């Protein structure tokens, strides 16, 4: 019996060793990759942008025709129903975001994803968005079912809007592991729409290879967005309030919305009556570590401004003529600490994968070498026999 369990022939031992090394080199790296591939449960990710010089409008005061509250010293700002730029505040702005994941009890192939994003002027919250999705852990796309929830709140005016049990398409915070050099549908939380985020180039951040993606949304009407989605009132603690489509449009003489240069550009007289509404546009540059699909850097150039229609909004953006009518505008990038934290998060995984690549290559090389040695031993024994 021992004869069969413990082969005495050196040739047999060489063959066994070759098989072991080949199995190690072939099986172990993919096993680790498959283990780290799905979106992990129990993530708790905090990101914050570096304080960025930006502008925001006291829109409620402007719409109500109240005394100008902005930081402009223009004499016109002392007038009743002052021009729109008299309500602008120039501040250091930041965006904070917390994103968490959790398991879905009924299906371990899915994960809950929840996020809270807050826009701050100093310590003062200007707006916040909460979002809930159920994601496929392999693709990081939301499931094809009405599982999503979204809420937008303006704390200063104690109002907002919410959506529940709707279906969305496109990734948002998580890219799939094994990110490819191609375009992906990207869901924008502010506009509630999905458009392509496009691969642009590769680069290294602190020695880690990353893929760069660019996402751009042409100016779109937030009034149209509000009209095209089904929303619910927001219970802000002092009663349920909801932004309606009519709340997004305001009217008045052109001189209240456009200075002389802008009126010349748009062909308007000071007394022409105009109706304007908020338009939103954003350009994003995203850096992704492709093995894990982890976002390691994000820059967003956000503009929300008043314009009469889509054509005028496009003209204003093309001529960089949006600031005086800005509801919000800032070019924001993750802080150095946030980028370092995200890179530190992926660094151990990258090191392990690189080590396993060496193990895989070495295991296969040793296994092949041992098989060649076994073949030589067999041929020599055959000749001697």
Protein language model features and the residues they cover:
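Solvent-exposed N-terminal domain segments of exported/luminal and surface proteins
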Residues: 2-158
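Juxtamembrane interface at the cytosolic side of transmembrane helices
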Residues: 2-15, 29-31, 351-385
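Proline-rich low-complexity regions
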Residues: 36-40, 174-176, 253-262
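Extended interaction regions within the primary functional domain
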Residues: 88, 218-219, 357
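N-terminal short leaders/motifs
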Residues: 144-161, 233-248
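Short N-terminal edge-element motif at the start of the domain
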Residues: 157-192
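Membrane-proximal low-complexity regions enriched in glycine and acidic/polar residues
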Residues: 184-304
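Membrane-proximal extracellular "stem/stalk" segments
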Residues: 267-359, 371
């Amino acid at each position: 019996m021992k004869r069969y369990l413990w082969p005495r022939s050196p040739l047999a031992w060489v063959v066994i060793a070759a098989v072991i090394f080949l199995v190690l080199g072939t099986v172990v790296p993919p096993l680790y990759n498959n283990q780290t591939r799905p979106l992990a449960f129990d993530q708790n990710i905090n990101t914050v942008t570096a304080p960025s010089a930006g502008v925001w409008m006291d829109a409620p005061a402007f719409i109500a025709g109240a005394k100008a509250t902005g930081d402009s010293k223009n004499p016109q700002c002392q007038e009743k129903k002052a021009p729109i730029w008299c309500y602008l505040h120039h501040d250091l702005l930041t965006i904070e975001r917390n994103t968490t994941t959790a398991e879905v009890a009924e299906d371990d192939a899915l994960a809950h994803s929840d996020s809270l994003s807050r826009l701050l002027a100093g310590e003062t919250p200007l707006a916040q968005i909460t979002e809930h999705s159920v994601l496929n852990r392999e693709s990081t796309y939301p499931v094809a079912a009405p599982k999503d929830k979204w809420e937008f709140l303006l704390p200063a005016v104690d109002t907002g809007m919410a959506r529940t049990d709707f279906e969305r398409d496109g990734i948002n915070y998580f890219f799939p592991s094994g990110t490819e050099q191609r375009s992906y549908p990207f869901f924008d939380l502010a506009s509630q729409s999905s458009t392509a985020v496009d691969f642009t180039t590769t680069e290294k951040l602190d020695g880690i290879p990353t893929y760069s993606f660019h996402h751009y949304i042409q100016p779109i009407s937030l009034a149209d967005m509000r009209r095209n989605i089904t929303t619910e009132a927001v219970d802000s603690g002092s009663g349920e309030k909801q932004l309606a489509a009519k709340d997004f449009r305001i009217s008045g003489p052109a001189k209240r919305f456009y200075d002389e240069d802008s009126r010349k550009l748009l062909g308007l007289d000071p007394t022409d009556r105009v109706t304007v509404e908020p338009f939103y546009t954003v350009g994003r540059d995203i850096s992704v570590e492709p093995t894990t699909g982890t976002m390691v850097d994000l820059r967003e150039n956000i503009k929300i401004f008043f314009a009469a229609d889509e054509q005028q909004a496009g003209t204003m953006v093309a001529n960089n003529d949006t600031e005086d009518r800005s509801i919000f505008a800032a070019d924001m990038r993750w802080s150095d600490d946030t980028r370092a934290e995200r890179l530190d998060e992926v660094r151990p995984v990258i090191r392990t994968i690189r080590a396993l690549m060496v193990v895989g290559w070495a295991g296969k090389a040793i296994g092949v070498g041992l098989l060649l040695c076994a073949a030589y031993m067999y041929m020599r024994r055959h000749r001697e026999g």
